[in-house]
């Protein structure tokens, strides 16, 4: 037998070759096993279901001989295949010749039966040996005995397959001597990055592959690349990590000018080869490098360098390196990757809110989650760091060990940049090396963050900034990103841009942009602005009053962008404007004029709007804009929504490029000017709720119009000619509809109230319609069967049509996913027009039963039957809907039968823990329903909200307060779970719904007085009813490592204190009682090995704890965002 040293010196193509009988394990055990190997970056040979024959395929023989380890999965039918047995012969041969390692797995099979060829395995083996030579049989028997004598894994000795598979994978890592370094194992989210990178690296391939890691500064690219290097380096013959430190050290002993210097290139290559071959004194010459590494399987990481000369010198061509080599290039510049034909690119994205908070907590508390009294503060800090890993880490380390009061004092200062964060991000800005790109960066940071890309390009046109190229460069360098045609810049990068502008001058009026409230107020009040100011952006929600000098803008004659805005148009905050009567000047160079709640009746008389591109003045007090005709060739967008005093629109005959005109809720407007006929490029016209509008000029045909909203124009007497190619139309509550209306390309149509249909509805509609809304029309009595011609219809809303009795039968709208028939009070039959509906609203209809056929709606997620006063029964087949998330039967006062047999709980076994969710059921005011029976029959993945004033006797532990203390309880599993019930009293005379979260806090106390606190958020609830509510839910608390550290290493505790809280600060809500039933007392859980909220077989899986933690964080963040927005 070959020595282990000769084995380890071979250049293996694969780490593992699996030998198995596909009939038994391919789609079960083996698929999970191979997935775990992939997750750990262990390269396995995959046969891709090669057609099997009697002789061993050459490809399989190559796979066996080039694998470091052979894993033999012995199963019941393994010996039925001469193919498997011949594989085994080759494996034994490789074991003897060059020390191939072999790991046997006995899958539902006694090892002795394999070793001695007895039992059912022996019988199958004897059958296979028929018509075979004696020599073949003997060699097979010897191979079976040889491998079965090796210490392996017997599945019956393990509690579950998952644990065994993980142990085998770790065993393989150990045998391969490729156990990953522990340096990065505690990094939050690193495993997810490595898993995603593994598919790009495609390690099983023999090709030489270059892979890029791309993302903005501070997002964790270097951390990910170092973790990969640590994990992978020992799988390669050579490995080297190249960063700026490596380059600077290589240049220290050289006096040349730069990398273009040929000698410098050789010197850099010499340093590189010294790392590759682990030798100090290497002498090279022209072309030596590619020859020296040509047969070397190498891992090369080039981090944070976008210097073309460095890449050319060290990895100029993939042909330089041996088969299987991987070159990873880490950069902020996507263009650099493209230019070097690196097509496999991993984009590093910001972590989720939950992961960001976990990152911060690791830095601040050295734990995964914050102490309860720091939860909200920690969430706010993470929010202000914008989820950027660098910011989270720096802020966490700075706040570690500091008292809560200091945290509170520090929060206002977190809007600025920490020195380390600022320096890191500044490198990205300085790396632009182009003044135009730098200028675009500052424009976005100060003015345009969150604006539409198309608007930004128009506003910066003619600016000599080469905006198209500049935006592409900023995207490539991860300084901005584009989502849904909206441009976004990270909050810390935005703060960097603002800080750069602040350093331009100590005098705010001498700066390029004004972005701070104090500076803006000072400049506008004291008239200190100069020609250097290009833009002003002010959120009026930040101030209560604003003084504007009559000559404030005269010194700023280069002002291009004036943005005085509010994000809270729905809130009527009053700002005291001090605008002098003689205020008569705005710079004529303005391209963007946004002035929400403008306080005057018209714009300054000396303002010339010829350069305007975008005019937005929502909720203004304007009565008119200006007099006369102006050249408005550049104007693309005019938005005057909510300007209720506006009486006239100026002459727009020269606004020939206007694309969007929004006049919604301009309730004093009586007519449109005849000049709109010249708006040949108008695409979007919104005149909704112009309730005094009477006429639209006749003969107007806006051929480019795509969206038209005339909803609520109740006095409209004449209609414009609607183009046939329009795609979106809302004519609800209008006085009339023209009889010649034909809508060939219509995608969405909204009709309601006083609409009089002069022609049958279906003749008006395009078969490509995807959404139809038809509401509040008492004359509508039936839906015609011809609706089936709308084969692309996805959303159908027929609401409050109180004389609608039936829907057509025998049709199936395949595309329909949402159906709303609410308040159709005469509708008695359950709809049967589509089997693909996911959202069904039948509230306040006359339906009497949920039929057996409900099971056909296999994709149903939401069912609303609130207020169905005739509803008598709900079919038990509803429990077969495996996607159902919420069902509301509140105020179904005649409902007597609602059976939930729990048969769908079998489905839950198949769901991943992270995707697992409860079914929320609402039975408030169902007075004839046996609520006690309903609670007792509740399956373990549901929540209930019911009517009630006290906790039912079903719950063995009850109290009229908000907390319960339990004495010592013996626990056999690594979790604590129970069914909880709270009595919530709603005292409100508002018609608005009341929502609330329930928080359950458990304090586990051991016999020494040590305690550990854990919190669960069982759900979010909503109600519109007064009085008492019973809320029933299931809670789950895992006993993780942190828990056992506190409680003497065992699942033992003296008692548990359980407190129920309402997290909402709402005086309308009171918690008046609570109760619990321990999980072992829940009938539906008798045979469950896990908690009510957890899947069988995975009760120790950390994913469950993460799921609970993410739920908690999501709810906390929602409340926090609401609080921040209301400031």
Curated annotation (Swiss-Prot):
<feature type="repeat" description="LRR 9">
    <location>
        <begin position="791"/>
        <end position="813"/>
    </location>
</feature>
<feature type="modified residue" description="N-acetylmethionine">
    <location>
        <position position="1"/>
    </location>
</feature>
<dbReference type="Pfam" id="PF07725">
    <property type="entry name" value="LRR_3"/>
</dbReference>
<feature type="repeat" description="LRR 10">
    <location>
        <begin position="814"/>
        <end position="834"/>
    </location>
</feature>
<dbReference type="Pfam" id="PF00931">
    <property type="entry name" value="NB-ARC"/>
</dbReference>
<dbReference type="InterPro" id="IPR011713">
    <property type="entry name" value="Leu-rich_rpt_3"/>
</dbReference>
<feature type="repeat" description="LRR 8">
    <location>
        <begin position="766"/>
        <end position="790"/>
    </location>
</feature>
<dbReference type="GO" id="GO:0061809">
    <property type="term" value="F:NAD+ nucleosidase activity, cyclic ADP-ribose generating"/>
</dbReference>
<feature type="repeat" description="LRR 7">
    <location>
        <begin position="680"/>
        <end position="704"/>
    </location>
</feature>
<comment type="subunit">
    <text>Interacts with EDS1.</text>
</comment>
<feature type="repeat" description="LRR 11">
    <location>
        <begin position="835"/>
        <end position="857"/>
    </location>
</feature>
<dbReference type="GO" id="GO:0043531">
    <property type="term" value="F:ADP binding"/>
</dbReference>
<keyword id="KW-0433">Leucine-rich repeat</keyword>
<feature type="repeat" description="LRR 4">
    <location>
        <begin position="610"/>
        <end position="632"/>
    </location>
</feature>
<keyword id="KW-0611">Plant defense</keyword>
<dbReference type="InterPro" id="IPR000157">
    <property type="entry name" value="TIR_dom"/>
</dbReference>
<comment type="function">
    <text>Disease resistance (R) protein that specifically recognizes the hopA1 type III effector avirulence protein from Pseudomonas syringae. Resistance proteins guard the plant against pathogens that contain an appropriate avirulence protein via an indirect interaction with this avirulence protein. That triggers a defense system including the hypersensitive response, which restricts the pathogen growth.</text>
</comment>
<dbReference type="GO" id="GO:0007165">
    <property type="term" value="P:signal transduction"/>
</dbReference>
<keyword id="KW-0378">Hydrolase</keyword>
<feature type="repeat" description="LRR 5">
    <location>
        <begin position="633"/>
        <end position="656"/>
    </location>
</feature>
<feature type="repeat" description="LRR 1">
    <location>
        <begin position="197"/>
        <end position="221"/>
    </location>
</feature>
<protein>
    <recommendedName>
        <fullName>Disease resistance protein RPS6</fullName>
        <ecNumber>3.2.2.6</ecNumber>
    </recommendedName>
</protein>
<dbReference type="GO" id="GO:0006952">
    <property type="term" value="P:defense response"/>
</dbReference>
<dbReference type="InterPro" id="IPR027417">
    <property type="entry name" value="P-loop_NTPase"/>
</dbReference>
<feature type="repeat" description="LRR 3">
    <location>
        <begin position="587"/>
        <end position="609"/>
    </location>
</feature>
<feature type="repeat" description="LRR 6">
    <location>
        <begin position="658"/>
        <end position="679"/>
    </location>
</feature>
<keyword id="KW-0007">Acetylation</keyword>
<feature type="repeat" description="LRR 2">
    <location>
        <begin position="540"/>
        <end position="563"/>
    </location>
</feature>
<feature type="domain" description="TIR">
    <location>
        <begin position="12"/>
        <end position="176"/>
    </location>
</feature>
<dbReference type="InterPro" id="IPR035897">
    <property type="entry name" value="Toll_tir_struct_dom_sf"/>
</dbReference>
<dbReference type="InterPro" id="IPR044974">
    <property type="entry name" value="Disease_R_plants"/>
</dbReference>
<dbReference type="InterPro" id="IPR036390">
    <property type="entry name" value="WH_DNA-bd_sf"/>
</dbReference>
<dbReference type="Pfam" id="PF23282">
    <property type="entry name" value="WHD_ROQ1"/>
</dbReference>
<feature type="active site">
    <location>
        <position position="87"/>
    </location>
</feature>
<keyword id="KW-0677">Repeat</keyword>
<dbReference type="InterPro" id="IPR042197">
    <property type="entry name" value="Apaf_helical"/>
</dbReference>
<dbReference type="Pfam" id="PF01582">
    <property type="entry name" value="TIR"/>
</dbReference>
<dbReference type="InterPro" id="IPR032675">
    <property type="entry name" value="LRR_dom_sf"/>
</dbReference>
<dbReference type="InterPro" id="IPR002182">
    <property type="entry name" value="NB-ARC"/>
</dbReference>
<keyword id="KW-0520">NAD</keyword>
């Amino acid at each position: 037998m070959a020595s282990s040293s000769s084995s380890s010196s071979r250049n293996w193509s694969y780490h593992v070759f699996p030998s198995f009988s596909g009939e038994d394990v391919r789609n079960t055990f083996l698929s999970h096993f191979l997935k775990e190997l992939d997750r750990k970056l262990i390269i396995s040979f995959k046969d891709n279901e090669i057609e099997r024959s009697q002789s061993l395929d050459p490809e399989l023989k190559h796979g066996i001989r080039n694998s470091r380890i052979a894993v033999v999965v012995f199963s019941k039918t393994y010996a039925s295949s001469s193919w498997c047995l011949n594989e085994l012969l080759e494996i034994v041969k490789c074991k003897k010749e060059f020390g191939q390692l072999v790991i046997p797995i006995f899958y539902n099979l006694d090892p002795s039966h394999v070793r001695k060829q007895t039992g059912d395995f022996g019988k199958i083996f004897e059958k296979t040996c028929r018509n075979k030579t004696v020599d073949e049989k003997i060699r097979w028997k010897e191979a079976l005995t040889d491998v079965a004598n090796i210490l392996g894994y017997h599945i019956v000795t393990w509690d579950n397959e998952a644990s065994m598979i993980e142990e085998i994978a770790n065993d393989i890592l150990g045998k391969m001597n490729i156990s990953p370094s522990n340096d990065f194992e505690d990094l939050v989210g690193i495993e997810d990055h490595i898993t995603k990178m593994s598919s790009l690296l495609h390690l099983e391939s023999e090709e030489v592959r270059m892979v890029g890691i791309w993302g903005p500064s501070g997002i964790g690219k270097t951390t990910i690349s170092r973790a990969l290097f640590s994990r992978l380096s020992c799988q390669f013959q050579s490995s080297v990590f190249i960063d700026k430190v490596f380059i600077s050290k290589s240049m220290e002993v050289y006096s040349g000018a730069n990398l273009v210097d040929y000698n410098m290139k050789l010197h850099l290559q010499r340093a590189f080869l010294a790392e590759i071959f682990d030798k100090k004194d290497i002498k090279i010459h022209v072309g030596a490098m590619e020859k020296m590494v040509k047969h070397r399987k190498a891992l090369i990481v080039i981090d944070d360098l976008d210097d073309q000369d460095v890449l050319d010198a060290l990895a100029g061509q993939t042909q330089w390196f041996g088969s299987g080599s991987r070159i990873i290039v880490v950069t902020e510049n996507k263009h650099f990757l493209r230019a070097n034909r690196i097509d496999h690119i991993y984009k590093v994205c910001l972590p989720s809110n939950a992961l960001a908070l976990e990152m911060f907590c690791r830095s601040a508390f050295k734990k995964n989650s914050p102490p309860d009294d720091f939860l909200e503060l920690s969430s706010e800090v993470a929010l202000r760091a914008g989820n950027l890993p660098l910011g989270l880490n720096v802020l966490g380390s700075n706040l570690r060990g500091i008292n809560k009061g200091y945290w509170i004092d520090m929060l206002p200062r977190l809007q600025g940049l920490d020195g380390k964060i600022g320096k890191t991000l500044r490198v990205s800005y300085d790396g632009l090396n182009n003044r135009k790109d730098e200028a675009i960066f500052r424009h976005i940071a100060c003015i345009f963050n969150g604006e539409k890309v198309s608007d930004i390009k128009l506003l910066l046109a003619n600016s000599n900034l080469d905006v198209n190229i500049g935006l592409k460069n900023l995207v490539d360098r991860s300084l901005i990103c584009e989502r849904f045609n909206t441009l976004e810049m990270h909050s810390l990068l935005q703060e960097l841009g603002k800080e750069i502008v602040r350093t331009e001058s100590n005098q705010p009026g001498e700066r390029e942009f004004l972005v701070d409230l104090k500076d803006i107020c000072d400049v506008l009040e004291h008239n200190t602005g100069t020609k250097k100011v290009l833009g002003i952006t002010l959120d009026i929600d930040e101030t209560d009053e604003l003084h504007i000098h009559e000559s404030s803008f005269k010194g700023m004659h280069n002002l291009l962008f004036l943005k005085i805005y509010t994000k809270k148009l729905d809130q009527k905050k009053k700002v005291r404007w001090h605008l002098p009567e003689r205020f008569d000047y705005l710079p004529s160079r303005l391209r963007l004029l946004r002035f929400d709640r403008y306080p005057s009746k018209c714009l300054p008389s000396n303002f010339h709007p010829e350069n305007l591109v975008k005019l937005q003045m929502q909720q203004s007090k304007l009565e008119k804009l200006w007099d006369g005709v102006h050249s408005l060739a550049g104007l693309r967008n005019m938005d005057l929504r909510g300007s209720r005093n506006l009486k006239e629109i100026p002459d727009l005959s020269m606004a020939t490029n206007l694309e969007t005109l929004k006049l919604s809720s301009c309730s004093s407007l009586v007519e449109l000017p005849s000049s709109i006929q010249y708006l040949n490029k108008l695409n979007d016209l919104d005149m909704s709720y112009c309730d005094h509008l009477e006429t639209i000029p006749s003969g107007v045909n806006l051929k480019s119009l795509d969206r038209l909203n005339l909803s609520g124009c109740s006095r409209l007497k004449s209609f414009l000619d609607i183009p046939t190619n329009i795609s979106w139309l809302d004519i609800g509550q209008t006085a009339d509809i023209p009889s010649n209306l034909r809508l060939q390309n219509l995608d969405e149509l909204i009709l309601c109230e006083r609409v009089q249909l002069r022609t049958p509805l279906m003749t008006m509609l395009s078969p490509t319609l995807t959404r139809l809304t038809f509401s509040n029309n008492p004359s509508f009595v039936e839906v015609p069967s011809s609706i089936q011609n709308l084969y692309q219809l996805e959303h159908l809303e027929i609401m409050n049509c109180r004389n609608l009795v039936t829907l057509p039968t025998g049709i199936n709208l395949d595309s329909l996913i949402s159906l709303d028939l609410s308040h159709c009070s005469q509708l008695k039959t359950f709809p049967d027009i589509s089997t693909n509906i996911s959202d069904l609203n039948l509230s306040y209809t006359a339906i009497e039963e949920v039929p057996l056929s409900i099971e056909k709606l296999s994709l149903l997620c939401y069912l609303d039957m609130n207020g169905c006063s005739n509803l008598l029964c709900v079919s038990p087949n509803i429990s077969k809907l495996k996607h159902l998330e919420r069902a509301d039967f509140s105020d179904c006062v005649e409902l007597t039968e609602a059976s939930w047999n729990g048969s769908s709980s079998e489905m839950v076994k198949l769901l991943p823990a992270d995707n697992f969710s409860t079914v929320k059921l609402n039975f408030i005011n169902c007075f004839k329903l046996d609520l006690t029976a309903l609670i007792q029959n509740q399956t373990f993945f549901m929540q209930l909200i019911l009517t009630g004033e006290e906790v039912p006797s079903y719950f063995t532990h009850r109290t009229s307060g908000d907390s319960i203390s339990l004495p010592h309880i013996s626990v056999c599993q690594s979790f604590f779970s129970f069914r909880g019930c709270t009595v919530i009293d709603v005292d409100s005379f508002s018609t608005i719904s009341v929502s609330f979260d329930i928080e359950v806090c458990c304090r586990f106390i051991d016999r020494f007085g040590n305690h550990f606190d854990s919190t669960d958020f069982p759900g979010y609830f909503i109600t519109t009813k007064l009085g008492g509510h019973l809320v029933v839910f299931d809670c789950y608390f895992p006993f993780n490592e942190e828990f056992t550290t506190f409680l003497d290493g065992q699942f033992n505790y003296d008692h548990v204190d359980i407190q129920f809280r309402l997290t909402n600060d709402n005086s309308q809500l009171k918690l008046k009682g609570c109760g619990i039933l321990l999980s072992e007392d829940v009938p539906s859980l008798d045979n469950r090995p896990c908690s009510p909220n957890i899947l069988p077989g995975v009760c120790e899986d950390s994913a469950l704890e993460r799921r609970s933690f993410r739920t908690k964080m999501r709810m906390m963040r929602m409340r926090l965002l609401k609080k921040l927005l209301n400031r």
